Curated annotation (Swiss-Prot):
Residue span, LRRCT domain: 137-175
Protein name (database record): Leucine-rich repeat-containing protein 51
Tissue: Widely expressed in adult and embryonic tissues. Expressed in the developing choroid plexus from 12.5 dpc and in the epithelium of the developing airway tract from 14.5 dpc. Also expressed in the postnatal inner ear.
Domain of life: Eukaryota
Organism ancestry: Eukaryota, Metazoa, Chordata, Craniata, Vertebrata
Amino acid sequence: MSSRDYMNTSVQEPPLDYSFKSVQMVQDLVTEEPRTGLRPVRHSKSGKSLTQSLWLNNNVLNDLKDFNQVVSQLLQHPENLAWIDLSFNDLTTIDPVLTTFFNLSVLYLHGNGIHRLGEVNKLAVLPRLRSLTLHGNPIEEEKGYRQYVLCNLPRITTFDFSGVTRADRSTAEVWKRMGIKPKKVRAKQDVL
């Protein structure tokens, strides 16, 4: 199968779905059976999946150690990985390994424990990233969260499942020109 044929067919392939498997370590994926959907994932002659989507949501992953190696074992063309769903895990940072997938266009990280807004900056190197979710992380509580993300990731067209509007772009551009930094929202203290 030519590279062009692969790109055309794999986009339509169902995801390799390891969601709701209580996976604790990325290495466990090698021995874990993926969930089956209405359409089965096709495999190459070597047994690797012919898909560009990997769903790891609703597990208990707290790091992505050995992610590249495991993805290479699972996918025939890991370099073409376009969609990664890591939502509802226990991640506290955006692992730099995610920035090695230059064809990544959809990345779901909502419902984790990411607490430093600066983590978002790592994703700026992904030229095709268009859809990103981060809601449900502690960073969402920072004032200016949306503007900060859109300022640093100007190619995003969908953020937290909402389309990016012209007004969003305009506000993000103002933030960028003015060098505005987001502020942590402080919990109100009861005054006696």
